[in-house]
Amino acid sequence: MASKRALVILAKGAEEMETVIPVDIMRRAGIKVTVAGLAGKDPVQCSRDVVICPDTSLEEAKTQGPYDVVVLPGGNLGAQNLSESALVKEILKEQENRKGLIAAICAGPTALLAHEVGFGCKVTSHPLAKDKMMNGSHYSYSESRVEKDGLILTSRGPGTSFEFALAIVEALSGKDMANQVKAPLVLKD
């Protein structure tokens, strides 16, 4: 069986934990992860001044698709940059149309709203993004730490990054694989 593929879109101002933890967990599960820089291949300064080097540019990554999941990290500035990108919109719309999984965490779900993706789904987000997500009644809102409704998977923030990442693994590779990856992480149940 061919390994699953994930695209993580990295924008300036992304939240570090919400980027790195899903990348790490998915790679532990054998998922081929591409970290794509929204503004190109140059290192990206994240919300807490951690610098992450993308594998490639988003433009280049798009030519290597499709992906089994597209992941949108949060961070206020990062989510704003994702929300303002025509290329992100194109990728999300293609993913939605081909019935591929889309996962967004913290403020990342606001990019779904901006690009009119997943309307009608139940979502969650960082508590400070709730009002924005509920503007226009395009979604129903959940206070769950992780919410999966069909092919839209959302989560709340840095503290839910492991749960979010394991939910992506479970959606792509099954519960057994998620449990196998989780065991050595010494997470609190």
Curated annotation (Swiss-Prot):
Location of the active site: C106, H126
GO cellular component terms attached to this protein's record: axon; cell body; chromatin; cytoplasm; cytosol; endoplasmic reticulum; extracellular exosome; membrane raft
Lipid-binding residues (covalent, S-palmitoyl cysteine): C46, C53, C106
Major subcellular site: membrane
Modified residues (N-acetylalanine): A2
Post-translational modification, as annotated: Sumoylated on Lys-130 by PIAS2 or PIAS4; which is essential for cell-growth promoting activity and transforming activity. Undergoes cleavage of a C-terminal peptide and subsequent activation of protease activity in response to oxidative stress.
Positions where Cysteine sulfinic acid (-SO2H) occurs in the chain: C106
Residues with N6-succinyllysine modification: K182
Site feature: Cleavage: D149, G150
EC primary class: hydrolase
Subcellular location: Cell membrane; Cytoplasm; Membrane raft; Nucleus
Chain positions with N6-acetyllysine modification: K148
UniProt remark on cofactor binding: Deglycase activity does not require glutathione as a cofactor, however, glycated glutathione constitutes a PARK7 substrate.
CDD domains: GATase1_DJ-1
Record-given protein name: Parkinson disease protein 7 homolog
Species: Rattus norvegicus
Gene from which the chain derives: Park7
